[in-house]
């Protein structure tokens, strides 16, 4: 047996012996082999995205005033003061996805996250409350979002040849939602 790291080996012409179990979730869902992060022909690297709602967006100082300590997660805040930035708070947090595994849209940067919220420097983008921001996910963010008890998972067929998975993350007691929306997993026979 093996996992996504064994995919190239299993598909090679080498004598692999008898393989009876390969867990290929990362390769299939994210469209990459895991040793060298090469794209797998016929699969999409953007099959699943995470969409989070803006719940606050203001121009603020990049650092708070006063003494700055580590976060609740043991991380030190950024040392560089970048002056005023377009700071945006999103309704998605560490309990929903691994922030280190999210790739923000061009011109935006993830600054940090609490259990319930993600802080984003929106750059030159002026975002309004209620707008949605779409992120690409790595395996760590995907696993956390799909196994989170705060995320509902729904499988939808986009077309006859493409399958989509939609996941909705909703914080307890909040009306805002974060959504993982795939754009396609490639062709799946018989779908």
Regions found by a protein language model. Give the residues of each.
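Active-site anion/phosphate-binding pocket segments in diverse small-molecule metabolic enzymes
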Residues: 1-184, 188-191
